[in-house]
Design a protein with these regions (language model features):
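N-terminal "arm"/small-domain region of PLP-dependent enzymes with the aminotransferase-like
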Residues: 1-57, 144-145, 150
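Conserved core of the PLP fold type I
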Residues: 55-160
Length: 160
């Protein structure tokens, strides 16, 4: 299959996800936003046959009910809410939408490890900005840069 790939991906470093422990009996895995617990009994009761039937169908591609609910909850307009199939898809859309002519993305040196991968995929330059000694971000490091700035809040994996 790789012989059909675009040459622009030849030097792309594959993404390596964080540690995926095998023995989960004594651990609660938190690094991939998975819930280690079963659904609450109230959730199980709320699922009825009609909803189970809907599980075989594609969801609304515009996510209208979800966007409406989130906009109402946060008191913002629908045009201020974006929904996607997980954070990686949303990030891909954001990289496409906000890539500047300079082609640079600035983000903390210690942050989400997929940012450099997206930079490679979209032909952008990844500029890693050092953190302060206490792992916090110095906003002045980003003043006047010629590209898109990514500030994750809270920053992963530092939590700051």
């Amino acid at each position: 299959m790789s012989r059909f790939l675009s040459s622009k991906y030849e030097d792309l470093e594959p993404y390596t996800p964080g540690e995926q422990p095998k023995n989960m009996k004594k651990l609660i895995k938190l690094n991939t936003n998975e819930n280690p617990y079963d659904p609450a009994p109230e959730v199980l009761l709320a699922i009825n046959n009609e909803e189970i039937e809907k599980l075989r169908l594609y969801s609304d591609p515009e996510a209208a009910p979800l966007i409406e609910a989130a906009a109402g909850f946060y008191g913002v307009g629908r045009d201020m809410v974006m929904a996607g199939n997980g954070s990686d898809e949303v990030l891909a859309f954001l990289f496409m939408a906000f890539q500047q002519k300079s082609g640079r993305f600035y983000f903390p040196e210690i942050s989400y490890s997929f940012y450099p991968v997206y930079c490679s995929v979209f032909g952008a330059e990844a500029v890693k900005v050092p953190l302060k000694e206490d792992f916090s971000i110095d906003p002045s490091d980003y003043y006047g840069v010629d590209g898109t700035i990514i500030i994750t809040n809270p920053n992963a994996p530092t939590g700051i």
